[in-house]
Amino acid sequence: MSEHQSLPAPEASTEVRVAIVGVGNCASSLVQGVEYYYNADDTSTVPGLMHVRFGPYHVRDVKFVAAFDVDAKKVGFDLSDAIFASENNTIKIADVAPTNVIVQRGPTLDGIGKYYADTIELSDAEPVDVVQALKEAKVDVLVSYLPVGSEEADKFYAQCAIDAGVAFVNALPVFIASDPVWAKKFTDAGVPIVGDDIKSQVGATITHRVLAKLFEDRGVQLDRTMQLNVGGNMDFLNMLERERLESKKISKTQAVTSNLKREFKTKDVHIGPSDHVGWLDDRKWAYVRLEGRAFGDVPLNLEYKLEVWDSPNSAGVIIDAVRAAKIAKDRGIGGPVIPASAYLMKSPPEQLPDDIARAQLEEFIIG
């Protein structure tokens, strides 16, 4: 397990002050989800959350205090309006009252690919000083929801989090928590990070990972496997630009294969986005096939299709990740939060079996 650097713990507050970068479908589901479970009973079990009260923090303790985007239909608008604006097309689960949080113009950098650029209008507002904005809003945790392939932009916001002393939750497949150089930056600064690349509650990756492990545990030789995903949101449109996909494919592939003992040839594992189908909106369809050999080398094949609303499928996981990051911040812990990263992320610094990762995260919550 990685070493953490502990600094004198700041006085813990009763709320988790969150900033969001990238006010897309995932941000919409996150904000709506906090509203949906605002009055949930502490002891109840609700879909998609480890606990209603995660350590000292209830879902309703998550407060959105800042947001950054580049879309002209979102920048300058209240967060409650921006989450339903422009190309956002996820399912609505809750009404959201005005937040008095105005979406600010962040720097574009490499955050907009060619398909995004053809679809949205960029705000002509001047980018704000992100570090100053984080400090002024007294942010505890910054959640990065930038589009896939935003390497430069994600690292820019990661550095802003370090400079502002704000915990960082890296929801996209840019390797920061799992990069030893970046991990050391966060450790040296005494700033916690949970990353990289958020898992869904029950998505293509987790089902594929579990079934591949089931093959191995039951003595079936897994010879080859594939996972194809189609969806209708801006994430899938962005991923038509294959040059932005390298880290996404690596993240999804290692999330499945890292749980297995055997090594695979590159051609025997194909995992990644496939196409954009506009009428699916924020739904994702995953087609997964596993081919193996059972007793006597007799073929044993499994094929399934998973249909989900993509963004709500990870919103609860982010709520847990945010609260884990805040607990680490309260305790003065810097660097990657291994238990939270291993259980909640596809590409953590340290891959652990899911049951062990969950047990370690439960221990972390208790302290």
Curated annotation (Swiss-Prot):
GO terms for biological process: inositol biosynthetic process; phospholipid biosynthetic process. Its cofactor is NAD(+). Pfam families: Inos-1-P_synth (PF01658). It is an enzyme of class 5 (isomerase). InterPro entries: MIPS (IPR052199), Myo-inos-1-P_Synthase (IPR002587), Myo-inos-1-P_Synthase_actino (IPR017815), Myo-inos-1-P_Synthase_GAPDH (IPR013021), NAD(P)-bd_dom_sf (IPR036291). NAD(+) binds at D78, A137, Y157, S200, D235, K248. GO terms for molecular function: inositol-3-phosphate synthase activity. Its EC number is 5.5.1.4. Signal peptide: none annotated. The keyword Isomerase applies. Keywords: Inositol biosynthesis, Isomerase, NAD. It catalyses: D-glucose 6-phosphate = 1D-myo-inositol 3-phosphate. Key enzyme in myo-inositol biosynthesis pathway that catalyzes the conversion of glucose 6-phosphate to 1D-myo-inositol 3-phosphate in a NAD-dependent manner. Belongs to the myo-inositol 1-phosphate synthase family. PANTHER family: INOSITOL-3-PHOSPHATE SYNTHASE. This is Inositol-3-phosphate synthase. It comes from Mycobacterium tuberculosis (strain CDC 1551 / Oshkosh). The lineage of its organism: Bacteria, Bacillati, Actinomycetota, Actinomycetes, Mycobacteriales.
